[in-house]
């Protein structure tokens, strides 16, 4: 493992060894750890008590962060006629049908999210034509994440406002950006608790034992702050009831 630089070691010394922080303490500390010369993304990593090798224990979904991610997403929509007009009015960056499919087939991928109406998925044969291009990049429209939908306007607005997709990796870890270092502590905290609340609601029935195994937040260029998982479900429920 490569030796960390002096700056990283100095930041690491700000984290008490062996201590688990409350969500609010962790958010306060992670802002102090973001000392790079750019506005660092604050990332959340949650290890869940699931076995992702089993289909009934995979956790996948989307969440709309109340304060957004701090990054403007380029949204592409496969739609025609009235639905295409809805997409444009909602703020989609690229709207089209066969023209966009051909552009993507030729190597163009200058977008962050792809949304499609259910009918156009079939008429343009999007799964078979673009599956190998968009699938590995996590860009393939999918009903499970709300990117295959007839409510195009709502989907576009939500992704523009800060909707993010997530899924467990092969280790059972979910990675979600919860904002930028320039965000207020309140904004980062609200975004953090919103993600945890969403994960709690998506807990698979087949998952046994402790659900939140570990929770960490970190800036792009800094060390991770461990969050105490004890009573986290109660904290989430209190926050949602407030």
Curated annotation (Swiss-Prot):
A GO CC annotation given for this chain: large ribosomal subunit
Keywords: Repressor, Ribonucleoprotein, Ribosomal protein, RNA-binding, rRNA-binding, Translation regulation, tRNA-binding
InterPro entries: Ribosom_uL1_bac-type, Ribosomal_uL1, Ribosomal_uL1-like, Ribosomal_uL1/biogenesis, Ribosomal_uL1_3-a/b-sand
Gene Ontology terms describing biological process: regulation of translation; translation
UniProt GO MF annotations: rRNA binding; structural constituent of ribosome; tRNA binding
Pfam family, one: Ribosomal_L1
Keyword Repeat: no
Family statement: Belongs to the universal ribosomal protein uL1 family.
Task performed by this protein: Binds directly to 23S rRNA. The L1 stalk is quite mobile in the ribosome, and is involved in E site tRNA release. Protein L1 is also a translational repressor protein, it controls the translation of the L11 operon by binding to its mRNA.
Assembly description: Part of the 50S ribosomal subunit.
Name of this chain's protein: Large ribosomal subunit protein uL1
Source organism: Dictyoglomus turgidum (strain DSM 6724 / Z-1310)
């Amino acid at each position: 493992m490569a030796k960390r630089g002096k700056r990283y070691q100095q930041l690491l010394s700000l984290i008490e060894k062996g201590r688990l922080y409350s969500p609010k303490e962790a958010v306060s500390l992670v802002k102090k750890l973001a000392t790079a010369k750019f506005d660092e993304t604050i990332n959340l990593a949650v290890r869940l008590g699931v076995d992702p090798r089993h289909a009934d224990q995979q956790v996948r979904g989307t969440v709309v962060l109340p304060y957004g991610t701090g990054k403007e997403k380029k949204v592409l929509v496969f739609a025609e006629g009235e639905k295409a007009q809805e997409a444009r009015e909602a703020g989609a960056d690229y709207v089209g049908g066969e023209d966009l499919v051909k552009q993507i087939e030729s190597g163009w991928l200058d977008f962050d999210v792809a949304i499609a109406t259910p009918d156009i998925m079939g008429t343009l044969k999007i799964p078979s034509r673009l599956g190998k291009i968009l699938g590995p990049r996590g860009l393939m429209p999918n009903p499970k994440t709300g990117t295959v939908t007839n409510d195009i306007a709502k989907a576009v607005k939500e992704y523009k406002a800060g909707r993010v997709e997530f899924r467990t990796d092969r280790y059972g870890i979910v990675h979600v950006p919860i904002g930028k270092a320039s965000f207020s502590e309140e904004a980062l905290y609200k975004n953090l608790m919103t993600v945890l609340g969403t994960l709690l609601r998506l807990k698979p029935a087949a998952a046994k034992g402790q659900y939140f195994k570990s929770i960490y937040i970190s800036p792009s260029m800094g060390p991770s702050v461990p969050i105490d998982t004890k009573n986290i479900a109660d904290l989430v429920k209190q926050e949602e009831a407030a």
